[in-house]
């Protein structure tokens, strides 16, 4: 007798993909964390020191190294993260301001069309 599954299995279909909203290519990139700046610097070193390490192993080794670092060693990465956060906030504010301006212009166009 075949086993009957009681769980509803949802598989993504082509119609599901069509329902997703498109991402705006002009949207600013998110700010990187101090850890991500550290990873950018250290990933190649870890890979050369451990050539047999898998992607997951490299990630684990990076995490271990990050946790072993003291505050002074982390400061350059935290400074980069702070600067990147300021950049992201500034770009996001500009992006939102552009969006509001274009929405107001579109609304004004609609209202002028309605008057005619």
From Swiss-Prot:
Gene Ontology annotations of biological process type: DNA repair
InterPro entries, alphabetized: HMG_box_dom (IPR009071), HMG_box_dom_sf (IPR036910), HMGB (IPR050342)
Stretches with biased composition (Basic and acidic residues): 1-27, 68-109
Principal subcellular localisation of the protein: nucleus
Keywords, ordered alphabetically: Chromosome, DNA damage, DNA repair, DNA-binding, Nucleus, Transcription, Transcription regulation
Keyword field contains Oxidoreductase: no
SMART domains: HMG (SM00398)
Source domain of life: Eukaryota
GO CC field: chromosome; nucleus
Pfam families in the cross-refs: HMG_box (PF00505)
GO molecular function: DNA binding
Database matches in PROSITE patterns: HMG_BOX_2 (PS50118)
Subunit structure: Weakly associates with the stable SPT16-POB3 heterodimer to form the FACT complex.
Protein name per its UniProtKB record: Non-histone chromosomal protein 6
The organism of origin for this protein: Cryptococcus neoformans var. neoformans serotype D (strain JEC21 / ATCC MYA-565) (Filobasidiella neoformans)
Native organism taxonomy: Eukaryota, Fungi, Dikarya, Basidiomycota, Agaricomycotina
